[in-house]
């Protein structure tokens, strides 16, 4: 609107652009709420045996977005090198009821090296899928080679997984926790474990390390405090009489 009135002003139809003096309200950042260690332990215990246990597990220990983990295909999983190629996502096409693959949020594929526990979870999922496929034979539907599917091989609906997650969180009395907070939990724990910001940025698929720093400023502030405490202890040790 501001730009449109500016163009009209140049033609002489109006003398002043009244919107030029209007200050837009600042949009506050959404506060991130990663799971605390005790909450994460309770969550992992609660999801044991859950239909989507391995989906949640992979997200919380890789930081993948929901669409990225639901769009992961077996050709992008390298068990020998312990790597995952994240090059697409899967979800509902905007304005339709159709589910399909689409490009990543930043349109930048990334290769991440996953922890042993994550690869073990994926191997477990592979074996489970093979068992389902053997039982259904010609009825198996996974033509897209998806890692996470229903027992018939169909894709998982984002909303179905989300609603199941919210039920878990309600049982844990953590109703305010959002699905995306699993990704935040991974990021904060990575930083607290000593991963450098560039590695965390690349694993998360952020455009820049500066963006990652901005989003997780509270975590890095905590790390600075811990660093100062370690230095204080070091000074104490080297200056002892």
Q: What are the roles of these predicted feature ranges?
A:
Residues 81, 92-111, 116-118, 123-124, ...:
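C-terminal secondary-structure termini that scaffold catalytic or DNA-interacting sites
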Residues 89, 115-175:
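Active-site/catalytic core of tyrosine-dependent DNA strand-transfer enzymes
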Residues 1-20, 65:
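N-terminal DNA-binding recognition helix of tyrosine site-specific recombinases/integrases
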